[in-house]
Amino acid sequence: AFARVCALLLLLMACLAGWPAWAAGSAKEVVTTPHVRAELVAHAPDGVSPGATVWVGLQLAHQPEWHTYWKNSGDSGQPTQLQWTLPAGVTAGDIAWPLPKKIPIGTLANYGFEGTVLLPVPLTITPAFKVPLLSGDIEVKLKAAWLVCKRECIPEEGEFALKIPVKGSTALNASAFQAALDAQPKAVAGAAGATPGSSVTIDGTAIKLKVAG
């Protein structure tokens, strides 16, 4: 009987040893493929509190000669897609897309990113947000899908999870977020005599004209 109990205990210990990896699934901060290193990062220098805006983002580091796509991919391609799972009282905005570069593929003109790019997303902390009593962190989960191309294109995806302290500062990637936000398309200052409400915006290689009235 004692030997049987010992055997059962050993079996239970073996099962428990494998439990964390199985229970946590595949979600993590970094996903690496042969073509891209993708990382979920955050910027919350003042912590997390109702009324605040916290920034998160997917940072893609491409292998040489590989690229992913902008929101307007051009003649071909598909933009990176982000699907968030957030705590109650936290809502995600749209990607604040930085300006892309023109990537010619044969006779096609595409718009996307090479090297390293950060796709920032604002999280709004609404009055409905309740501070977690036990952990002191909020958990941000992301399922992302991207099309990475050289000459051929390969669809890839990853599941990410990141904890952000409610109190305290998360600012390790401050410079990367600032650079990405600075690289957004800028509105051109209105010319003298322009109709109020009219605007001109440079978006990639396109000039968008909005005329009021």
Where are these predicted regions, by residue range?
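Extracellular/lumen-exposed scaffold segments
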Residues: P20-G213
